[in-house]
């Protein structure tokens, strides 16, 4: 399997090179040149690590299959408390794929607990011995998951950039208290798009690469612009489907819809890849919060980032520049020239419009909708009162949207974070007065609902804060060169 840039068909690399580089030299994203076909009958009874090995092996063909099996087992057997790919019935026809039972209580753990192993092996496959410096822009969850995955690894350094005042207090403390001599964390005076754009500029700056090369350092990324982030996320779509069949909730071969709360389009794109591999997926439903640039795009074909940026109670979706959409545009248009043109328009004018054929192909696979904070809070309350099901603010957005677009097909909502990562907002949604402290809110939410508090979150206020530096977006380059 080879990978090419979304912007230049002549940029061809192996999977190891795609994972090590992260971003293509022309600014494009690496995509597979073909989709392996899933062996659904053979895969349906596999454990989560076994299924992960099969999916990974189809794309990462320059990795030894035995290594992939060992890496998957080391990642998913213990760290997810026996709940990797856990599917919970909410009510008839509606299910929640709970992706927050990993060590940092967010879906990013599925990729970022495995990806460090893939990166280290990629360096071995390619005979690379220099230090790898990983730059991460995060709206909250990716930062902690990446820090937890890469902390302490020899030959690896990681720098995380998050929007100051743009995360929950729990998310901030998860990053600010991270242990490890090879980790650095910076708050950026701006929003997520400022952080992400700053990091992308560093990757595209030849002078940065040249200076770091003199010091035997190369850059890589742990954001979902890196193929190594996406491929592990394909697995849980298959696993969820097989569990629904096993439970008798879905007939074999029956299409299932998936509703995904997303801002950067990576998690839902993994579902598109699963569909291309042969999984019976009906619609992939893109759920946005008030920053609804993706909803507008899927409806109209015009991507217009020239709009007000809103801080919401679902901060991991507070994004206006959705990086992974570029991959979908390449797959549905089949034209790197078109993609390069659209991305150039976005960089120059803040918007672009795709052709009618491209839009029709997107709408054939994707539906969409959006929900603001008020609707999300009402949904948290409704799901708890009606179904005794507690969800976080991002998952609530997806439940809202799922209800507006549901067909007769079973609907799986991807639950992307523990409700205890946003305890004040969840508690307020349940009609309680939220304390000022997230930790007091955790305790109150536990009393109110009886749902256990994840141990990794409950101890955060006892850990020393190591990182409290705030920088301007323009200083991201200097931080990358430190």
Which ranges hold each PLM region?
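PLP-dependent amino-acid enzyme catalytic core
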Residues: 1-482
